[in-house]
From Swiss-Prot:
This protein's UniProt keywords: Allergen, Antioxidant, Copper, Cytoplasm, Endoplasmic reticulum, Metal-binding, Oxidoreductase, Zinc
A GO term, aspect molecular function: metal ion binding
Record field: transmembrane: none
Essential cofactor(s): Cu cation; Zn(2+)
Organism this protein belongs to: Olea europaea (Common olive)
Cofactor notes: Binds 1 copper ion per subunit.
Expression sites (tissue/organ): Expressed in fruits, leaves and pollen grains.
Activity regulation, short description: Inhibited by KCN and H(2)O(2).
Enzyme Commission (EC) number: 1.15.1.1
Coiled-coil region: none
Family: Belongs to the Cu-Zn superoxide dismutase family.
UniProt-recorded name of the protein: Superoxide dismutase [Cu-Zn] 1
Protein's cellular compartments: Cytoplasm; Endoplasmic reticulum
Species classification: Eukaryota, Viridiplantae, Streptophyta, Embryophyta, Tracheophyta
Catalysis performed (reactions): 2 superoxide + 2 H(+) = H2O2 + O2
Amino acid sequence: MVKAVTVLNSSEGPHGIVYFAQEGDGPTTV
């Protein structure tokens, strides 16, 4: 299982948080 948390930042500061979890062996696209 792969877990990752990505924080998107912009000139205004924190723009949003993207969370995705993957199980098995499949391609992950962001």
